[in-house]
């Protein structure tokens, strides 16, 4: 059982954020606020969500994309991070797992995920 002050603090951190509903297999576009010196800029990161873990303020998710020369790039983001400007769901993926770590071993067409039909 958590302390009531910690619960109040966490609720205050969560209430201002508008996080879309997404799960593993979805293709996301993240707008990340990057501070370089005294300037800030927005950098986009687009990839497949391969895992979500935790709950509350400490919830995180892993996004994987194929970078230059087919090098896989994975980044872990806290969902309620101040540096995340926005999260956009581009495609819903049809997967049967909650953790898609097997995509690390796949290349090219084998790494594709079917789109969820509505």
UniProtKB/Swiss-Prot annotation:
It comes from the Bacteria. Gene3D superfamilies: 2.30.30.790. GO terms for cellular component: cytosolic large ribosomal subunit. The keyword Ribosomal protein applies. Keywords: Ribonucleoprotein, Ribosomal protein. SUPFAM superfamilies: Translation proteins SH3-like domain (SSF50104). One of its GO terms (biological process) is translation. It holds the Pfam family Ribosomal_L19. InterPro entries: Ribosomal_bL19, Ribosomal_bL19_CS, Ribosomal_bL19_sf, Translation_prot_SH3-like_sf. GO terms for molecular function: structural constituent of ribosome. PANTHER family: LARGE RIBOSOMAL SUBUNIT PROTEIN BL19M (PTHR15680:SF9), RIBOSOMAL PROTEIN L19 (PTHR15680). Belongs to the bacterial ribosomal protein bL19 family. This protein is located at the 30S-50S ribosomal subunit interface and may play a role in the structure and function of the aminoacyl-tRNA binding site. NCBIfam families: rplS_bact (TIGR01024). This is Large ribosomal subunit protein bL19. It comes from Campylobacter jejuni subsp. jejuni serotype O:23/36 (strain 81-176). The lineage of its organism: Bacteria, Pseudomonadati, Campylobacterota, Epsilonproteobacteria, Campylobacterales. The gene is rplS.
